[in-house]
């Protein structure tokens, strides 16, 4: 499950298949990604549907400013309620994206991001959700994006080759 600052604007175009877009050879393909969690990358393509939507709704607001809104929403978040809902659907496991390509960690990490110190959640969303999920008899898995991190390379990523070039290789 992706639940990040990109959930605040919660927008992505719904009329494209990412596989088809990448095969098209269009150097801007991922700028038209149908995935909300790619919102920040899509903003880097000025004529993308995300960038157009963002300008119309949020003006020149920076993507990272959505983190404050997202964290404010945590005040009413109940991980046990979520876990109960997942269990009621018959789910046997829950996989949480603990850090997506935007670089924001969903736990208070003791290892600061050298490019953006403090870009992490004050609340331990990962630990709390994991505990609640297990308490409801389900397995808990995590996904961590280590290869792509837009705090290290903020160039627009339109094709797979851009993603490969953006993988941090050390300073």
Model-identified regions with their sequence ranges:
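Mature catalytic domains of secreted/periplasmic carbohydrate-active enzymes
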Residues: 1-171
